Every structure is written in C-alpha cells, then in structure tokens.
From Swiss-Prot:
The PPIase FKBP-type domain, residue ranges: 161-246
Substrates-to-products reaction catalysed: [protein]-peptidylproline (omega=180) = [protein]-peptidylproline (omega=0)
GO cellular component term, pick one: cytoplasm
Protein name listed in UniProt: Trigger factor
Gene: tig
Gene Ontology molecular-function annotations: peptidyl-prolyl cis-trans isomerase activity; protein folding chaperone; ribosome binding
Keyword annotations of the record: Cell cycle, Cell division, Chaperone, Cytoplasm, Isomerase, Rotamase
EC number(s) from the headed UniProt entry: 5.2.1.8
Organism in which the protein naturally occurs: Klebsiella pneumoniae subsp. pneumoniae (strain ATCC 700721 / MGH 78578)
PROSITE patterns linked: FKBP_PPIASE (PS50059)
Length: 432
C-alpha cells in the first residue's frame, strides 16, 4: 500500500492510496471461494460448483464488493499509520480500475484542529455570593399567591397589575393594518406583551370609557411595514379586574405538599427549593464565565463537518419542541442554527482538550451526587435514583455532565476567580 497526504485547505486533507494488484486479486479469489461454498446452481451440489462458473456468474459483483472493502480498510490503515484524526465522514474518490493493475483512489476529509490551550491564567471569573433571605422567601410566597389568585371585577381606574378586557382598532396614517384589530381581548397589565406605550395609555382609565392612544412601533418590530411607524389605537375598555390573593390557609399550603399545613412548613419548603435553584444558578453563572473566557483565549479552526452535524442535532431538537417531524426539521434554515452550532463545537473541542491534558475521568461520587441533587426535586427521590441506576444511557449522560463540570473546575483552578455579593433576584434574573 502506497500512501500520500496533502492539505487541501485549512483543515481539509486528501489522502491518496494505491492498492497493489496482487492484493486485490488475492482478496477476490478468497471471497469467490467463500461464495462457492454457499451458492446453489442447478446441476451442481452445494459447494461443488466449479470456480470458473462461480467467477463467471459472481466475479463482477464480488470484485466490486472487495474493492469497496479494501478501500475502507486501507484508508483506516493509512490514517493510523499517518496519525491522522478525521472529523466527520470521509468522501471516497475512486480512480479508474483496470483488471490486473494497481488501483489508486483518494479520500477527502477534514481533521480535528490541533488545540494548544493558552491564556487560562488570564480568564477572569466573578463568583456570585448569595444567600436566600427572609425577604426573598416573602417575595416568593407573594409570587405563589399571585399564581393562585382569582380575578375580581373592580370599578376603579386601571392599575399596573390589573387585568383588562378591551376592543381595539389600530391605524397608521389613518389606515387600519393587518393584525391591528381585536374584540374582547384580555390583557394582563405589566407583562410587556404589547408594544411600548400601549399599556401606559390604558392605565388610569375606567371600564366603559372609549379613548385613543398614540404609540410608535419599535424599529425591531417583526412586521416590516410597521417598523418605526407612529400609530393610533382606539380603545374600548370593557372590563377592569384586580387580583384577589388567597390567604395562607392550611388548605392553600397543603397544595404545595406541606403536610402539616403550617406557614412555617411552607416557608421551609420554599426556602429549600430556592436554595437548590440558587446553587444551580451560581454553578451555571461561574461555568458560563469560565467557558466564555476559554473560548475568547483560544481561537481555533472548526471542521465544517462537525458544524453540519451539530446543526442537524439542533434542527431535530427544535422540531421536537414544536411538534414537528424529521422531514420538517431538515427543512429549517441552517442559518437559524449555524452560530449556535459553531459555538457548541468550539466549546466541545476546548473542553475535550482540557479533559485530555488533565487526564480527567468522570468521578462516580460526583455522578451520584448530581443524580441525588436532581432527584430531590421529585416527590419520591429514591425512585428517580433507582431509575437512573438501571438506565445505562441516562447514567452515561450524567457522567458526561460530571466530566464537563470537572473540566470547568480545571479551568477555574488556573483562572482569576473573585467573589461578588449579589441578591437572589439579581442572580436569577441574569439566568432568565
């Protein structure tokens, strides 16, 4: 076998391989012997068909199969010999085959980039220092009450947290536009669902009033014909409702799994859940800074084949989220996913190098702790832990999570890490 390697462009490689004629012929003869043992031809007993008849009938297809197999095997031998690490599927470029002559073909592919980690000691990470305060628990309890609130009609003017039922008609330069009209439209104030100025124009009005508000569509508005345009909306305010919050009764508290129905029990349960969320948020915040610093400090070429593969993964995930099928997934424009896919490939390659250079392996104690932490959010944690322990795929996924955490910790060990006091709400809003 003769092998030559050339760089086509960037990470592109072209390996040219020549297979000796006698290697091909020996492989063909060997395969024809195997075929002769199995075939049945009228007039001959099984395994007793003369080789010239076997060769006449099956020679062409056997030769084609043998060539394909030899091309694959010689390519593998070549990249092992040349210490090449292909990224993505190779593209075989067969040469012209002539019986009794050496056969030359080429294989084109991309290779993984050579990564030499640098700048780890210059990465700056700010670790949030947070604790869940009584005031944070109070705020969360108020949120829970709001989520369980009922709506009660009121006679007064619209406030910031009320709910209104309206009819509206919008116009630009005196002309109504598509999507600018609705009847019995229910709008919860303060959620930012409408364009800027719309809700502000409703505040202070009472049910039964009809009025006109002036607004301007944002420059980034999705409808091209409305971007930056001044508009008028005629509003008919039909109903105003205010929240009626439930009291912290025993019945209300038991809805959240607090068996004794006490306020103290609810506060303890809420605090426990908030502290679990907080732990994850701090971990994610630190991790994102470490990875961002790693990426900025290490610019690498990325194989297009890996980006294409990651785009397919993201397409399928998007289709699943929105109830689509695989065909619909492949029709989604690659531009929607290209930047995210490239980022994920870069991060994967860099963390992979961190793992390799630090000779990291998944810590089974960490894997166990991660599973137990995740399971603690469920009603029966032991059942979840057992389910994971019996599922190899889930366990492997969790080992990958643990290994990634260990890689991030290896980066943090060399980075400049400082601490910054912050509040629960501030940190959680950063995660949103």
């Amino acid at each position: 076998m003769q092998v030559s390697v050339e760089t086509t462009q960037g990470l592109g490689r072209r390996v040219t391989i020549t297979i000796a004629a006698d290697s091909i012929e020996n492989a063909v003869k060997s395969e024809l012997v195997n075929v002769a043992k199995k075939v049945r031809i009228d007039g001959f007993r099984k395994g007793k068909v003369p080789m010239n008849i076997v060769a006449q009938r099956y020679g062409a297809s056997v030769r084609q199969d043998v060539l394909g197999d030899l091309m694959s095997r010689h390519f593998v031998d070549a990249i092992i010999k040349e210490k090449i690490n292909p990224a993505g599927a190779p593209n075989y470029v067969p040469g012209e085959y002539k019986l009794g002559e050496d056969f030359t073909y080429a294989v084109e592919f991309e290779v993984y980039p050579e990564v030499e980690l640098q700048g780890l000691d210059a990465i700056e990470v700010e670790k949030p220092v947070v604790e869940v305060t009584d005031a944070d628990v109070d705020t969360m309890l108020e949120t829970l009450r709001k989520q369980q609130a009922t709506w009660k009609e009121k006679e007064g003017a619209v406030d910031a947290e009320d709910r209104v039922t309206i009819d509206f008609t919008g116009s630009v330069d005196g002309e109504e536009f598509e999507g600018g009209k609705a009847s019995d439209f229910v709008l919860a104030m303060g959620q930012g669902r409408m364009i800027p100025g719309f809700e502000d124009g409703i505040k202070g009005h009472k049910a039964g009033e009809e009025f006109t508000i002036d607004v301007t569509f944002p420059e980034e508005y999705h409808a091209e014909n409305l971007k930056g345009k001044a508009a008028k909306f005629v509003i008919n305010l039909k109903k105003v409702e205010e929240r009626e919050l439930p009291e912290l009764t025993e019945e209300f508290i038991k809805r959240f799994g607090v068996e004794d129905g006490s306020v103290a029990g609810l506060r303890a349960e809420v605090r426990k859940n908030m502290e679990r969320e907080l732990k994850g948020a701090v971990r994610n915040r630190v991790k994102s800074q470490a990875i961002e610093g790693l990426v900025k400090a290490n610019e690498i070429d990325v194989p297009a084949a890996l980006i294409d593969s990651e785009i397919d993964v993201l397409r399928r995930q998007a289709a699943q989220r929105f109830g689509g099928n695989e065909k619909q997934a492949l029709e989604l424009p690659r531009e929607l996913f290209e930047e995210q896919a490239k980022r994920r490939v870069v991060v994967g390659l860099l963390l992979g190098e961190v793992i390799r250079t630090n000779e990291l392996k998944a810590d089974e104690e960490r894997v166990k702790a991660l599973i137990e932490e995740m399971a603690s959010a469920y009603e029966d944690p032991s059942e979840v832990v057992e389910f994971y322990s019996k599922n190899k795929e889930l366990m492997d996924n969790m080992r990958n999570v643990a290994l990634e955490e260990q890689a991030v910790e290896a980066v943090l060990a060399k980075a400049k890490v400082s601490e910054k006091a912050t509040s629960f709400n501030e940190l959680m809003n950063q995660q949103a």
